[in-house]
């Protein structure tokens, strides 16, 4: 049985291990950045009828930044030519994390992905959610 996983994202500053610091007000690049989010698995009922919960903070590497975009007028519908790349991963690795607050939960693990590289690219709907980004 597949159980849904609820995630809430809490932004954290980039780790201090980077050789150069990025000024978020001026960067026009895409960077790997560390994020922390709260992962919550759905509650279950144990054999005594008591609810058992499972959650914990998870740190992942993700992409963050800004990309140059443009639009120019055109004589054909939709009367514009759009160029809107997004900051997205160029590689990722999967890992399994054990959540910290899961006493009595049968499987306290979740699968997460870490970005290994980031770049400004056009959205790929086969691997990313591209709503309202493709034109």
Curated annotation (Swiss-Prot):
Signal peptide annotation: 1-19
Major location (coarse): secreted
Tissues where the protein occurs: Expressed by the venom duct.
Keywords: Disulfide bond, Hormone, Secreted, Signal, Toxin
Disulfide pattern: 30-87, 54-102, 63-118, 67-120, 123-130
GO terms under cellular component: cytoplasm; extracellular space
One annotated GO molecular function: toxin activity
S-adenosyl-L-methionine keyword on record: no
Compartments it resides in: Secreted
Pfam families: Cys_knot
CDD domains linked to this entry: GHB_like
GO process terms (BP): G protein-coupled receptor signaling pathway
Matching PANTHER family: GLYCOPROTEIN HORMONE BETA 5, ISOFORM A, GLYCOPROTEIN HORMONE BETA CHAIN
Protein family (similarity comment): Belongs to the glycoprotein hormones subunit beta family.
Record note on quaternary structure: Heterodimer with GPHA2; non-covalently-linked.
Stated name of the protein: Thyrostimulin beta-5 subunit
Species annotation: Conus victoriae
